[in-house]
Amino acid sequence: MAMQSVRRSRAVRRSTSLLAVVVSVMVVAGLHAAAAAASPASDEADAQKNKALVLSGPMTTLKAKLQGKTNVDFGPNCDTTTGRVKIPSVYAPPCVQPFTGKNGGATSQGVTGDEIKIVVYTGDPQKDPLLAGQIRAAGASLDIEPIRQTWQGYVDIYNKMFEKYGRKISVEFYLASGPGSDTAAAKADAIAIAEKKPFTVLGGPAQSTTVFADELAHRGVLCLGTCALAMPQKLSDRNKPYLFTEGPSPEEAATLTAEFIGKQAGPGKAQYAGNDATKNKNRVYGIVHYDTPDGQYKGLFDTLKTQLKKNKITPKADQSFFLDLSRAQENARTIVTKMKDAGVTTVIYTGDPLTPGAVTKEATAQDYHPEWIIGPTVLADTSIFARTFDQEQWSHAFGVALVPGRTPQDLNATYNLYQWFHGTPPPNNTYGVINPSVLLLATGVQMAGPKLTPQTFRDGLYRSPPSGGDPINPQLSYGKHGAWPFVDNYGSDDAGMLWWDPSAVGEDEVHQVGNGLYRYADGAKRYTLGKFPAKGQGGLFDTASSVTIFDQLPPADAQPNYPPPAAGG
């Protein structure tokens, strides 16, 4: 078992947006973090399940199998052994036959015979004091030019390596007009971008993506990846087929959380609590959950309650809160008082990565020592934020790991992909935020075929088989592939199990060495719905079988060794 590594990663210039420092450390930490060999057999089985969809699309390796064709030339960018594009990533899509002929020209807004126009939104630290302070605290530069260079660098990779049917992806950058928390600015920016008539938008205002994405979709513009972070299911449903993100929906994450709690922390003694008195009590559950003034995340809370009930758990208390840093201490006092007065032994937390800092410190002030269960969160399951929580309290925290097991930078496939293609490292440390969104776009374009529209883009994502599912690669799929009992417009399908170890030493997600790391149970194994282990299994709080940071890739996750393109792009 590879254990934690404290070696320093290669130096990288740190220029960033709010997405990189605050919201999408989740992606930096591991989503699309490394590569593993694809499984042709599982791809072919999935193609049989989605036969009509695969047959209706371009000639792919999977379509050729279904039609019994063995003499299709898929070109030099295809690994004929795996049937996927020859890039060092488990998320490479199936190969398609190189295109010749007419592509239909202007098939959609932002699409011409030779171009796919996209807009990349970047935050402006000069207009956002909170963002600027966070960037400086992370040791980063306020210069946004390197982040634009990195966006363009990944676009260049997929322009060369993926099929775009005679077109190329063309990037226009848009600088935010206000801070990421300004919903009025977010809406105005979405309108201004929509008036440019792009095919899609990547990136968005971190705290206002629901407003931003909703406005873009309403105006017929696709919003992909970090454009639509933590998007509630109802927002996606009313905006089909314009919103696709990389992570699970909040409701999907809640469903996975409820299964985890039912199997690993169901009714019984609160054995992981912070003092003996609480450990000897039967579990009493409470939920602390983030929402917005207009109730965007009520669906998450309702789903969590419903799914907990299916697992024989009925919370005794709940407390919602808004993310208002000026009232953090007041909110914390309200939350802790309510949980303590209700006799809650087991607090289920779902929300942002800042609130637990105030809440855990207030819990200590009130001599309240419950179990803390980490549910659907944005970044509370990352070490960079968990180190800011009360360490004694958080040493009794455990839950679902939406992010996968971590690797140091020199084993990170997103980092190495850039180096492989360009011959140089990414210009800054936001590569983990950037690449997944560009890959999502390029995959949908390749799998859509020459007539590119939002509808064929959706079908392209749906016909691509699931990828990942190992300790350092979340399973990623869109459509209906068996992970969920419905057609799914969200990305990752699985989760691991973790707990906080305040004594572990190593790098956080922005490569700062310090005390405190999450331990991933059972070698960071991940589980889809219905597959979480029963109590006493799965290695929760078993240090010997856990991992903090892989110092070498598990054998099954070794990166494919392809020669780089001759021209380096």
Model-predicted regions and their roles:
Residues 1-14:
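N-terminal secretory signal peptides that target proteins for export/translocation
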Residues 73, 198-318, 371-399:
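Extracytoplasmic ligand/sensor domains, especially the bilobed periplasmic-binding protein
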